[in-house]
Amino acid sequence: MGHVKILIAILVFITYSFVPVAYAQVKIGQKVPDFVTTTLDGQKFALKDYLKQPGNKVLILTFFATWCEPCGEDLKFLQKLQAQYGDQGLRVLCVFTGRISKVKAAKKYLEKLDVNLPVLLDKRRAISKRYKVTGLPCNYAIDREGFLKFKCLGCSEEVKRKFEENLRDLL
């Protein structure tokens, strides 16, 4: 019995010893993982290229799903911020974490909310895993050099107030 426990402990240690650095928790001030995916409309998207586009100063990367009720409120809030601060360099990109088979449902969800923000597809949750998304909605503020400036989870009034305050400091 003792040998089984030791063997399990060794296997767990070996397994977690080889977790790639790219999958480590993204910390404030660190460079965020780059990724390539497609948009909801089927266009190719590369984060590093997007960050370098003229006029882009701060990117909010928000992770959402259609089953997540607070995500709807968060998306409306972010659309309001995009309208308010877009001319100052704010860009908001939504990452749909649902299954690719649910793309039509995602489009309907966004139409129902009257949200017109660009949407990226998170195939097999690869982006969510790289960013260590543990709950929804989850927002990352990234500067044009690709560094994480702040992040938040949830959409309470206090979270939104602090989020907008931090955002204004970056713009």
Regions found by a protein language model. Give the residues of each.
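N-terminal targeting signals for export/organelle localization
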Residues: 1-41, 150-152, 161-164, 171
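A short beta-strand-turn-helix
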Residues: 36-59
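Solvent-exposed coil/turn segments that connect beta secondary-structure elements
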Residues: 40, 66, 97-100, 122-124, ...
